[in-house]
């Protein structure tokens, strides 16, 4: 099974080797036909502390690195 890749924005880089990435997705409501924006936060591994708040990044699914980290930052958009 291929690993998922998501695009998002770094909203926090305060912790060592970890960034928090906010990923927004849009979908159409099945009944009301209105487009809705939903966001979710992911803790992603950043081994070199390279990314700062506001950076647009891609994250990929990986093996569990810690209790909350199962994503790794692969590159900047």
Swiss-Prot record:
GO terms for molecular function: rRNA binding; structural constituent of ribosome. Coiled coil: none annotated. One of the primary rRNA binding proteins, it binds specifically to the 5'-end of 16S ribosomal RNA. It comes from Rickettsia bellii (strain OSU 85-389). Belongs to the universal ribosomal protein uS17 family. PROSITE patterns: RIBOSOMAL_S17. Part of the 30S ribosomal subunit. HAMAP family: Ribosomal_uS17_B. GO terms for biological process: translation. Disulfide bonds: none annotated. Transmembrane segments: none annotated. Pfam families: Ribosomal_S17. It comes from the Bacteria. This is Small ribosomal subunit protein uS17. Keywords: Ribonucleoprotein, Ribosomal protein, RNA-binding, rRNA-binding. InterPro entries: NA-bd_OB-fold, Ribosomal_uS17, Ribosomal_uS17_bact/chlr, Ribosomal_uS17_CS. GO terms for cellular component: cytosolic small ribosomal subunit.
